[in-house]
Swiss-Prot record:
Residues 1-129 are annotated as: Interaction with NCOR1. Residues 123-143 are annotated as: Disordered. It is found in: Nucleus. GO terms for cellular component: nucleoplasm; nucleus; Sin3-type complex. Its main location: nucleus. The gene is Sap30. It holds the Pfam family SAP30_Sin3_bdg. The modification Phosphothreonine is found at residues 5, 145. The keyword Nucleus applies. This is Histone deacetylase complex subunit SAP30. Component of the histone deacetylase complex that includes at least SIN3A, HDAC1 and HDAC2. Found in a complex composed of at least SINHCAF, SIN3A, HDAC1, SAP30, RBBP4, OGT and TET1. Interacts with HDAC1. Interacts with SIN3A, SIN3B, HDAC2, RBBP4 and NCOR1. Interacts directly with SAMSN1. Interacts with HCFC1. Interacts with SAP30BP.
Length: 220
C-alpha cells in the first residue's frame, strides 16, 4: 500500500477513497485465497503488525470506526475518515519526531481528518526545507508554520510586488510564473513580526495603501 501523497490529501476524499478501495479489494482477494482467513498484516516501523483490511468491499471506514493511530501512547478517539496510513508515511513522519504510530489493536488503516492534516503539514514542511534542516526543529514549529498561498493574490498585486523589490523577470509572464518568482523571493525575506504588524497598522490607519495604488497606476 502506497498511502496518500500531500496532493491526494489536498484534493479531499475522492483520491483518498480510491486508495482505500484498492486496499479493501486487495484484502478481500487475499482473504478469499486463504479460505476466508483473516486479512494479512501490514508491518509499520515501530508499530508492529496489524490487519490492513477494513469492512469487506468497503471504500472507506465502517460506521463508528475510530482513527487507527496512537498519539503520545494514547489511542485517538476521533472518527476515521477516508485517508489511510502506510509504512511510507510512518517513515516520513518518524524523521520529524512526531509521536504518532499505528495502534496494534486497530483492524483498519483509516485515520481521522486531524491526523491527515497533521501529516500533510509535516511532510510539506520537509519538502520545503529539505532533510538538511531537520536538526533542531521541533514538531510544534514544523506544524505551526503557515503556508502562504500566493496564488490567491491578483495578478496586479503580484506585479506590484515584483516592481517594488525589482525582481528580474522576462516580459509576458503569466500568473503561475509570477507566483513562482514572487514565492521564492517571499520565502527568503527575514521578518520581524513586531515591526511588520506595527507598519501594517500604521499603513491602514493612514490609508497608505490607497496612496501606493495611485502612485503605481501609471507604472506598467
Amino acid at each position: 500500500m502506497n498511502g496518500f501523497t500531500p496532493e491526494e490529501m489536498s484534493r479531499g476524499g475522492d483520491a483518498a477513497a480510491a486508495v482505500a478501495a484498492v486496499v479493501a479489494a486487495a484484502a478481500a482477494a487475499a482473504s478469499a485465497g486463504n479460505g476466508n482467513a483473516a486479512g494479512g498484516g501490514a508491518e509499520v516501523p515501530g508499530a508492529g503488525a496489524v490487519s490492513a483490511s477494513g469492512p469487506p468491499g468497503a471504500a472507506g471506514p465502517g460506521p463508528g470506526q475510530l482513527c487507527c493511530l496512537r498519539e503520545d501512547g494514547e489511542r485517538c478517539g476521533r472518527a476515521a475518515g477516508n485517508a489511510s496510513f502506510s509504512k511510507r508515511i510512518q517513515k516520513s513522519i518518524s524523521q520529524k519526531k512526531v509521536k504518532i504510530e499505528l495502534d496494534k489493536s486497530a483492524r483498519h488503516l483509516y485515520i481521522c481528518d486531524y491526523h491527515k492534516n497533521l501529516i500533510q503539514s509535516v511532510r510539506n514542511r520537509r519538502k520545503r526545507k529539505g532533510s538538511d534542516d531537520d536538526g533542531g526543529d521541533s514538531p510544534v514549529q514544523d506544524i505551526d508554520t503557515p503556508e502562504v498561498d500566493l496564488y490567491q493574490l491578483q495578478v496586479n498585486t503580484l506585479r506590484r510586488y515584483k516592481r517594488h523589490f525589482k525582481l528580474p523577470t522576462r516580459p509576458g509572464l503569466n500568473k503561475a510564473q509570477l507566483v513562482e518568482i514572487v514565492g521564492c523571493h517571499f520565502k527568503s525575506i527575514p521578518v520581524n513580526e513586531k515591526d511588520t504588524l506595527t507598519c501594517f497598522i500604521y499603513s491602514v490607519r493612514n490609508d497608505k495603501n490607497k496612496s501606493d495604488l495611485k502612485a503605481d497606476s501609471g507604472v506598467h
